[in-house]
Amino acid sequence: MKAGLWLWLMLGGAVGAVCRQGVVLALAPLVARLGFPVAVLGINVLGSFLLGLTLALAGRGVWPPEVRVAFGTGVLGAFTTFSTFSTELDELLGRGAVGLAALYAGLSVGLGLLAAVAGRLLGTRL
């Protein structure tokens, strides 16, 4: 990988991390009120959609491969978070909220997959 692409990857990662933290902070009152991790759920579903779109556009040559690396791996890799999903799932289970944990896991995987497919389909039509 070219040196300049590494820089774009790092900058993209910084942007994605800042965006994720902004969403988490903005939705913290709602998460506290609901007792359900809607912030990370929304982040991961949106990220899945955008990655599906990015991969489709890069795969068709609409966007150069460098955009896939900088935006897909950098921005979206830092924006989305499997580790936080896992620890939030563990927290729900730890407090005995088995039903909410199952709902969170099901929604995360199901909506994430649907969003990725929707993004890919949109990307094949643009």
UniProtKB/Swiss-Prot annotation:
Annotated GO CC locations: plasma membrane
Function recorded in the entry: Fluoride-specific ion channel. Important for reducing fluoride concentration in the cell, thus reducing its toxicity.
Keyword list, A-Z: Cell membrane, Ion channel, Ion transport, Membrane, Metal-binding, Sodium, Transmembrane, Transmembrane helix, Transport
One GO BP: cellular detoxification of fluoride
Membrane topology value: Multi-pass membrane protein
Location(s), subcellular: Cell membrane
Family, similarity comment: Belongs to the fluoride channel Fluc/FEX (TC 1.A.43) family.
Membrane-spanning parts: 5-25, 38-58, 69-89, 97-117
Record's catalysed reaction(s): fluoride(in) = fluoride(out)
Gene assigned in the entry: fluC1
Binding site for Na(+): G77, T80
Organism: Deinococcus geothermalis (strain DSM 11300 / CIP 105573 / AG-3a)
Entry's Gene Ontology molecular function annotations: fluoride channel activity; metal ion binding
Primary subcellular site in the record, as a coarse category: membrane
Full protein name: Fluoride-specific ion channel FluC 1
Domain of life of the organism encoding this protein: Bacteria
The keyword Transmembrane helix is assigned to this record: yes
HAMAP family: FluC
Stated regulation of activity: Na(+) is not transported, but it plays an essential structural role and its presence is essential for fluoride channel function.
